[in-house]
Amino acid sequence: MRKDLRIGALLATLAAIALVGLLIVMLPGAGPRATYGAKTGEIDERFAQGVLMLHAKQYEHALTAFHRVLALDPAMPEAHVNAGFALLGMGEAAAARDFFAAALELRTRQLNAYYGLAVASEQLGDLAAARGAMRTYAHLAPRDDPFRRKAEAALWEWDPGISKK
C-alpha cells in the first residue's frame, strides 16, 4: 500500500508560501507601505477636520485642511468638492467652480460636484452652465436625496421660459 503524500506536499507548499511572504515583508523596500499607511491616516484626519470646519462655517480653516489633503492625494474628488464648497462660503465662486470641475474630471458621477458647480455658475451669472450642472445633478440623484428638491426648485427658478410674478 502506497503512502499518500498529498497532505505533506500541501503543508510544505503552505509553509513555503508563508516563508516567502515573511521575507517580502522584511525586505528593505517594505518601508514605504508603512509610510503609505501613515499618509492615509493623515489624509483621513485632515479630511475629517476639513468637514468639521466646513460645517462650522470656518471656511478658511476648512480650505487649509482640504489643500493639505489634496497635497497628499491630488486624485481625491471629495476633497476637491469640499474645497469648492469652502471657497463658495468665502465668496470665491470662480475658484470654487474650478475645484468642482476638477472633481468631475476625476469622477464624473461625483453628484455633489454638479450641485456645487451649479451654485458657483449661478453666482458668476452663467445661468446656462448652472442649469446644465443642476439638471445633471437632478437626473443622477436618487429620489430620496435631501438636495434633490432644492435642485428642482433651482431649475424651476432658473428656467427662462417661466414667468416669475
Descriptions of predicted regions:
Residues 43, 77-78, 111-112, 145-146:
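Helix-start (N-cap) detector for alpha-helical repeat units in TPR-like alpha-solenoids
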